[in-house]
Amino acid sequence: MRKIKIITDSTAGLTLEEAAKWNIDVLYLTVEIDGKVYNPKTDITPEEFMVRMAETKELPKSSQPAIGSFVEAYEKYTAEGYEILSIHLTEKLSGTVNAARQAADMVEGNITVVDCDYTARGQAFQVLKAAEMAQSGDYSVEEIHAKINDIRDKTKLYIVVVTLDNLIKGGRVGRMQGFLGSLLNIKLIAKLTDGQLEEETKVRSNKKVLQYCLNLIKDEPKKIQHLDVVHANGLNLADDFIAESKEITGLTEIPLFFADPVISTHAGTGAFAFMYYTD
């Protein structure tokens, strides 16, 4: 029976139950608020982070896991006879996967590092399938890698930014443009494409946000296998979207998750995202 260990990072948004059930190791990105560094695993909950973020004038900073954390994990599991499949968020948003690659070069053993091209539950889709296949003992690393690449190619991820405050703080939107956007109640809908966030459209009310997002689901030509929703204090939109999407897709379950602090930093208060993969 093959011994394959799946490792990922915290931006995948796995629950503690999922990580335990599938024996997945999670390395945590940290966040810094007003000079103090927090580890989301031990120091701050996603809900607490939203409160702290609202209170600070500066945009919180996120930091990838140290290379030493990857080296430690890789050495531990290779010494126990495991092959390793290490799956991480797109390098367009973080240097995490590059840190993993550098660590893999420093450790002897069969270590495969994957840039999944996504983050949040779009990343989790690949991680959970990889862990399920690894736990069965019936598949090689190459077979698992091929399967998660297939899921990646069939995944779509959209994010709705309802306030431009964090984009202004982060310098992604000019202050005047941000002021006008807030004045006009503009909501930004973006799509993650090839690991890069790109503007999909702008709308001017929550009603139009919901309508646009539901139309994306309605117009999907292939059958949606799995649909997850993530929010950063954006429950109103997320709940309405889930209720309507169940009717459209026939899915009986559409899980809802609170966003990881790193995701919330970029998306801001009130944001929600949905991601799915198809046949």
UniProtKB/Swiss-Prot annotation:
Residues bound to hexadecanoate: 62, 94
Stretches assigned to coiled coil: none
Q: Which PROSITE patterns match?
A: DEGV (PS51482)
Domain of life here? Bacteria
Domain DegV residues, every copy: 4-278
Q: Which GO terms describe its molecular function?
A: lipid binding
Q: Which residues form the signal peptide?
A: none
Query: InterPro entries, from UniProt?
Result: DegV, DegV_C, DegV_domain_contain
What single Pfam family name could you report for this chain, choosing any that match?
DegV
- Name the keywords, alphabetized: Lipid-binding
Determine if Nucleotidyltransferase is one of this entry's keywords.
no
Quote the function comment for this protein.
May bind long-chain fatty acids, such as palmitate, and may play a role in lipid transport or fatty acid metabolism.
Record-given protein name: DegV domain-containing protein lmo1863
Q: Tell me the organism's taxonomic lineage.
A: Bacteria, Bacillati, Bacillota, Bacilli, Bacillales
